[in-house]
Amino acid sequence: MICALLALPSTIAHATPQLLHLGQPHPYVFLAYTNSDLHQAQPAEHAVVIIHGVRRNAEDYYQTGEQLLTNAGLTPRNTLLLAPNFLTATDPQASNDLPLWPKDRWMQGNESSAGHRGITSFSVLDDLLAYLADRRRFPHLKDVVLIGHSAGAQLMQRYAVMGKDFTSLPVRYVISSPSSYLYLDAKRPTATGFAPIPDNRCPGYNRYRYGLEQPPAYLASQRLDAVQLFRRYASRNVTYLVGERDTHADSKVMDHSCAAEAQGPNRLERQLGYLRYEGFLSRTWGVAVAHRQFVIPEAGHDAGHLFASPKVAEVIFPNKP
């Protein structure tokens, strides 16, 4: 087991793995890298949570988050940085008391299947928000930014759609360069608009995680139809990012399934297509939506490069101190 670090200064200069005690009434521990000693009450007014990609390299994403905060003029004293680590049983940090997922299933919201079993990655995000809203720990916290990139953005986009209502703190969602998105009906982008795909061309393309057929229990238990889901999603503060050079259709870490290819040939086109889809649903269902979208100049898929762009700091923190 990885031991929590108990004798640290209130703010920490470098990435430090700590165990967060999450979940009520069934507690569990979760590994995260952070710039603060979470065993003390914190002075932070803002929290930034950044979710890693498919390689589960949370420490690298912590460093990416540090650069982002530096570019935005934010310091460890006023801004808590957290980089949670969704682990598998083969990762060196794994232990039996941590939730562990089979390979990339965490990005879909699935339950942990080893270590501490039965924890969905959506529940982890719910529990992280509840943890941050605890005034005993964070008496001055004003808002939370949830950032996901690549595989982390696949989780984040689905959580932004399906996550339960949270009213304790304002939450902003940043969805950066995922391979696919959750569509809310059977239509997909075409050259002239949106239309269903014939079943014989792509069987199962509308099943979860690409559509709402056969949804996970986390969503099914909420008993919301597609219009209700979209209305809630449209009301949330969502920002989309993608690099202008994230156009490699043969990328080894991009989803090449038929269901993903139905959303576009590359990450740039898939994101722009989804923004058009939001506009289509807005007109069709009479739901106003104003999510922001930014193509980052000269950036490809690399998280360190994309989030180092001064433009990204301006976009994510428009009201920085």
Regions found by a protein language model. Name each.
Residues 86-119:
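Cap/lid segment of the alpha/beta-hydrolase catalytic domain
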